[in-house]
Amino acid sequence: MTRTNDASGGGKLPRKRFYRARAHSNPLSDSHFPVPISPEEVDLSQHYPRYFPADKGSDGEEAAAPQQIRFADVGCGFGGLLVGLSPLFPDTLMIGMELRDKVTEYVKERILALRGANPGQYDNISVVRTNSMKYIPNYFRKAQLTKMFFLFPDPHFKEKNHRRRVISMQLLDEYAYVMEVGGIIYTITDVEELGEWMRSCLEKHPLFETVPEEEIKADPVFKLLSTATEESQKVARNGGQTFYAIFRRISLQEE
């Protein structure tokens, strides 16, 4: 049974129907997957082999390596945003972080297929199965990231489950730690109450300030928020509204 579709250039793209999973997973449950002890333990050769070949002694020509991962798509789903961002920022390493195992496997296969069909492209994106609400500091150093994305996260409607939301005052402390000053955090949802919640948390946090609307509209990333992902496309097909909050990491004198 085939699990792929033809991609441009002769590669094979995986079919989503073979990788279906629940819309969301419980971020507070204990899942079993390897977690690096520290950012220094992250094996970049597994994610970006063109830039970080596992065989250091090979005579093959190695591409000049960007220094470190700079973008993180938290809860990346089927990887649409990563695929859209890759050609816009070809010299920037970016990673998707996804808790669902089948969805993570789909994104891995999708990236491999795109690399095979488009030599020299999509080498700067990858995905890892992990729980971002627990392990962000295990993957990124202080001030490492320049962009973080939270697109259509689980709304956790019940008040008792609000502690599972991926944007909270406590988690924003962690996100601020791994973001460089001037870095941008992007959020979008089709649930108005969640949109208000995320904006309120960011407005209250002392290390973030809202990005002016004219700057948002000029940002080439902004359009991708509502077009690149499976969720955003579903909202558009259904004629739904979206609610975004985009904030900049700022500095405090005591930092």
Swiss-Prot record:
The protein's UniProt keywords, in alphabetical order, are: Methyltransferase, Nucleus, RNA-binding, S-adenosyl-L-methionine, Transferase, tRNA processing, tRNA-binding
Q: Where is this region: Disordered?
A: 1-35
Question: Pathway membership of this protein?
Answer: tRNA modification; N(7)-methylguanine-tRNA biosynthesis
- Ranges of compositional bias, category Basic residues: 13-23
Catalytic activity reads:
guanosine(46) in tRNA + S-adenosyl-L-methionine = N(7)-methylguanosine(46) in tRNA + S-adenosyl-L-homocysteine
Give any single GO term for biological process.
RNA (guanine-N7)-methylation
Asked if the keyword Glycosyltransferase belongs to this entry, the reply reads no
Q: Name one GO molecular function term.
A: tRNA (guanine(46)-N7)-methyltransferase activity
Tell me the Pfam families matching this sequence: Methyltransf_4 (PF02390)
Q: Where does S-adenosyl-L-methionine bind?
A: G75, E98, L99, N131, S132, L151, T229, E230, E231
Q: Where does the protein end up?
A: Nucleus
State the active site: D154
Family annotation (SUPFAM superfamilies):
S-adenosyl-L-methionine-dependent methyltransferases
What exactly does this protein do? Answer: Catalyzes the formation of N(7)-methylguanine at position 46 (m7G46) in tRNA.
Task: Quote the protein name from its UniProt record.
Answer: tRNA (guanine-N(7)-)-methyltransferase
Q: Which organism is it from?
A: Zea mays (Maize)
